[in-house]
């Protein structure tokens, strides 16, 4: 997990995560900070193990840490900004070209339904990470009732 720690300590990662924190200050709905990124990583890794997908742990964690980073640049349409930021950060953290391509491909489509492989588990983990069952703002949430996580799954 040395490369994951390099991402976490990368100056650009820190700078953008601070921006996201400022943008979300006072937000009553789900946040997109490090806690969310780590929740997504852990859930995605559990899914990976349960479904015997054999996706490398560091690839899952790197994708999870970077998937929402673009919110610090363009909050609403963040996926492509996340890709651009990941392209700057990953080489500095010893990810090779093939790994970087795999990660940025997953980030670019992580919000789409019915993905498979890495992007699929990131998308599922992203949704499953939401603690709707414990949210004080659930009554005004924009999510449809059938999308809410009303039970603990992971």
Predicted regions: what is each one?
Residues 1-154:
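Metal-dependent phosphohydrolase cores
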């Amino acid at each position: 997990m040395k490369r994951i720690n390099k991402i976490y300590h990368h100056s650009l990662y820190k700078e953008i995560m601070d921006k996201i924190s400022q943008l979300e200050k006072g937000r009553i709905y789900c946040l997109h900070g490090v806690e969310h990124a780590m929740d997504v990583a852990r859930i995605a890794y559990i899914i990976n193990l349960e479904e015997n997908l054999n996706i490398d742990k560091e690839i899952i964690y790197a994708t999870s840490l970077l998937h929402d980073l673009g919110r610090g640049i363009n909050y609403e349409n963040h996926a492509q900004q996340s890709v651009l930021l990941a392209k700057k950060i990953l080489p500095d953290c010893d990810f090779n070209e093939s790994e970087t391509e795999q990660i940025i491909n997953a980030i670019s489509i992580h919000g789409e339904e019915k993905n498979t492989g890495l992007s699929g588990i990131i998308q599922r983990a992203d949704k499953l990470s939401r603690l709707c069952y414990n949210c004080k703002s659930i009554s005004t949430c924009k999510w449809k009732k059938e999308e809410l996580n009303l039970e603990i799954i992971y």
